[in-house]
Regions:
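Structured loop/turn residues at beta-strand edges in well-structured enzyme cores
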Residues: 20, 67, 104
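Residue-level signal for short amphipathic helical patches enriched in basic/charged
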Residues: 33, 67, 75
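Short polybasic/polar patches that bind polyanions
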Residues: 48, 65, 88
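Conserved G/P- and acidic residue-centered "switch" motifs that form tight phosphate/ATP-binding loops
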Residues: 51, 68
Length: 114
């Protein structure tokens, strides 16, 4: 896929069961050296609560480490409690806003990839 998700610095991971797409997550680089972003994590409603989001998060973190990134950032809506708890279990912590975003009620998070 072209654009910011293009390899070698960007990645897209998709989860399938019986050829049905059930989830995915993307990894674009940020301008800051060694920093990437987790974007577009989604799990289809039927498959939520079954570890798909956790598996995709683990895989994208490992992928980012393999590419050589030292930090990963993300943004999420503050109302998405389940997603925020998931990110916290992996070690993400809240940071200041890191890009210009017109949306309100957004939480920004970061993790060191060591």
């Amino acid at each position: 896929m072209p654009g910011k998700y293009a390899e070698p610095d960007g990645k897209i991971l998709l989860a399938f069961i019986n050829n049905d797409l059930i989830g995915g997550v993307a990894l674009p680089p940020l301008e800051e050296e060694g920093v990437c972003e987790m974007k577009r994590l989604f799990v289809r409603e039927k498959w939520r609560g079954q570890g798909v989001g956790r598996s995709l998060t683990k895989q994208i973190l490992n992928t980012a480490k393999g590419v050589g990134y030292s930090k990963m950032r993300l943004d999420t809506e503050k109302r998405l409690d389940i997603a925020i708890k998931l990110y916290q279990t992996f070690g993400f912590s809240e940071i200041d806003q890191y890009y210009d975003n017109p949306l309100e009620d957004i939480l920004y998070m970061e993790i060191e990839l060591t």
